[in-house]
Swiss-Prot record:
GO cellular component terms listed in the entry, alphabetical order: cytosolic large ribosomal subunit
Keywords assigned: Methylation, Ribonucleoprotein, Ribosomal protein, RNA-binding, rRNA-binding
Protein name (Swiss-Prot/TrEMBL): Large ribosomal subunit protein uL11
Residue ranges of the TM segments: none
Organism: Shouchella clausii (strain KSM-K16) (Alkalihalobacillus clausii)
Length: 141
Protein backbone atom coordinates (compact mmCIF):
# COMPACT_ATOMS: atom_id res chain seq x y z
CA UNK A 1 0.00 0.00 0.00
CA UNK A 2 1.23 3.49 -0.82
CA UNK A 3 2.35 5.76 2.00
CA UNK A 4 -0.04 8.57 2.88
CA UNK A 5 1.13 12.09 2.00
CA UNK A 6 0.69 14.53 4.89
CA UNK A 7 2.37 17.64 3.50
CA UNK A 8 3.84 19.19 0.35
CA UNK A 9 6.50 21.87 0.84
CA UNK A 10 7.75 24.09 -1.99
CA UNK A 11 11.01 26.01 -1.51
CA UNK A 12 13.57 27.84 -3.61
CA UNK A 13 17.08 27.14 -2.34
CA UNK A 14 20.51 28.07 -3.78
CA UNK A 15 22.05 24.95 -5.35
CA UNK A 16 24.43 23.09 -3.06
CA UNK A 17 23.81 25.50 -0.16
CA UNK A 18 20.86 24.03 1.75
CA UNK A 19 21.37 24.28 5.52
CA UNK A 20 19.09 23.95 8.57
CA UNK A 21 18.83 27.74 8.97
CA UNK A 22 15.71 29.54 7.71
CA UNK A 23 13.94 29.11 5.32
CA UNK A 24 14.71 25.37 5.12
CA UNK A 25 14.75 24.47 8.83
CA UNK A 26 11.40 25.92 9.93
CA UNK A 27 9.54 24.73 6.81
CA UNK A 28 10.72 21.14 7.20
CA UNK A 29 10.74 21.16 11.01
CA UNK A 30 6.98 21.76 11.06
CA UNK A 31 6.52 18.74 8.84
CA UNK A 32 8.71 16.59 11.10
CA UNK A 33 11.32 15.82 8.44
CA UNK A 34 14.97 14.96 9.15
CA UNK A 35 16.35 18.38 8.14
CA UNK A 36 20.02 17.36 7.92
CA UNK A 37 19.10 14.33 5.82
CA UNK A 38 17.27 16.58 3.36
CA UNK A 39 20.09 19.16 3.28
CA UNK A 40 22.78 16.55 2.55
CA UNK A 41 20.72 14.88 -0.18
CA UNK A 42 19.72 18.21 -1.80
CA UNK A 43 23.30 19.53 -1.75
CA UNK A 44 24.60 16.30 -3.31
CA UNK A 45 21.97 16.40 -6.06
CA UNK A 46 22.48 20.08 -6.94
CA UNK A 47 26.24 20.48 -6.47
CA UNK A 48 26.75 20.71 -10.27
CA UNK A 49 24.41 23.73 -10.55
CA UNK A 50 26.23 26.05 -8.13
CA UNK A 51 25.18 29.70 -8.23
CA UNK A 52 21.61 29.01 -9.37
CA UNK A 53 18.44 29.00 -7.29
CA UNK A 54 16.70 25.64 -7.52
CA UNK A 55 12.97 25.23 -6.81
CA UNK A 56 12.29 22.02 -4.92
CA UNK A 57 9.02 20.24 -4.12
CA UNK A 58 9.25 18.11 -0.97
CA UNK A 59 6.60 15.46 -0.31
CA UNK A 60 6.37 14.41 3.34
CA UNK A 61 4.75 11.08 4.21
CA UNK A 62 2.90 9.85 7.30
CA UNK A 63 5.98 8.03 8.66
CA UNK A 64 8.00 11.30 8.33
CA UNK A 65 9.96 10.01 5.38
CA UNK A 66 10.20 12.29 2.36
CA UNK A 67 10.93 12.49 -1.33
CA UNK A 68 11.76 15.59 -3.30
CA UNK A 69 11.77 16.73 -6.90
CA UNK A 70 14.12 19.46 -8.09
CA UNK A 71 12.84 21.71 -10.87
CA UNK A 72 14.73 23.87 -13.34
CA UNK A 73 15.86 27.30 -12.09
CA UNK A 74 13.35 30.17 -12.54
CA UNK A 75 13.51 31.92 -15.93
CA UNK A 76 14.31 35.21 -14.17
CA UNK A 77 17.43 33.69 -12.56
CA UNK A 78 18.62 32.23 -15.88
CA UNK A 79 17.98 35.56 -17.65
CA UNK A 80 19.92 37.51 -15.00
CA UNK A 81 22.83 35.10 -15.39
CA UNK A 82 22.72 35.36 -19.21
CA UNK A 83 22.59 39.18 -19.09
CA UNK A 84 25.24 39.39 -16.37
CA UNK A 85 23.12 41.54 -14.04
CA UNK A 86 22.29 41.29 -10.33
CA UNK A 87 18.65 42.37 -10.52
CA UNK A 88 16.02 43.40 -13.02
CA UNK A 89 14.82 46.94 -13.62
CA UNK A 90 12.69 48.68 -10.99
CA UNK A 91 10.81 50.36 -13.86
CA UNK A 92 10.86 47.84 -16.74
CA UNK A 93 8.74 50.08 -19.04
CA UNK A 94 11.09 53.04 -18.74
CA UNK A 95 14.52 51.76 -17.74
CA UNK A 96 16.12 48.90 -19.69
CA UNK A 97 18.97 47.22 -17.83
CA UNK A 98 20.44 44.76 -20.35
CA UNK A 99 20.08 43.01 -23.70
CA UNK A 100 20.04 39.28 -24.40
CA UNK A 101 20.40 37.59 -27.80
CA UNK A 102 17.50 35.50 -29.13
CA UNK A 103 19.68 32.35 -29.33
CA UNK A 104 20.39 32.70 -25.59
CA UNK A 105 16.60 32.94 -25.00
CA UNK A 106 16.17 29.72 -27.02
CA UNK A 107 18.80 28.02 -24.84
CA UNK A 108 16.98 29.14 -21.66
CA UNK A 109 13.62 27.99 -23.10
CA UNK A 110 15.08 24.55 -23.90
CA UNK A 111 16.43 24.30 -20.34
CA UNK A 112 13.03 25.27 -18.87
CA UNK A 113 10.99 23.08 -21.26
CA UNK A 114 10.32 20.18 -18.80
CA UNK A 115 8.71 22.58 -16.28
CA UNK A 116 6.74 24.78 -18.70
CA UNK A 117 3.33 23.92 -20.08
CA UNK A 118 4.40 24.92 -23.59
CA UNK A 119 3.75 22.74 -26.62
CA UNK A 120 6.85 23.86 -28.52
CA UNK A 121 10.21 25.54 -27.95
CA UNK A 122 8.86 28.64 -29.73
CA UNK A 123 6.00 28.91 -27.19
CA UNK A 124 8.49 28.46 -24.35
CA UNK A 125 10.66 31.20 -25.90
CA UNK A 126 7.67 33.57 -25.87
CA UNK A 127 7.18 32.86 -22.16
CA UNK A 128 10.86 33.55 -21.43
CA UNK A 129 10.71 36.73 -23.56
CA UNK A 130 7.72 37.91 -21.48
CA UNK A 131 9.71 37.37 -18.30
CA UNK A 132 12.62 39.30 -19.82
CA UNK A 133 10.32 42.20 -20.76
CA UNK A 134 8.95 42.40 -17.22
CA UNK A 135 12.55 42.57 -15.93
CA UNK A 136 13.58 45.39 -18.27
CA UNK A 137 15.74 43.17 -20.48
CA UNK A 138 15.67 43.80 -24.25
CA UNK A 139 15.70 40.79 -26.61
CA UNK A 140 17.65 41.31 -29.81
CA UNK A 141 18.10 39.05 -32.85
Amino acid sequence: MAKKVIKMVKLQIPAGKANPAPPVGPALGQAGVNIMGFCKEFNARTSDQAGLIIPVEITVFEDRSFTFITKTPPAAVLLKKAAGIDSGSGEPNRTKVATVKRDKVREIAETKMPDLNAASVEAAMRMVEGTARSMGIVIED
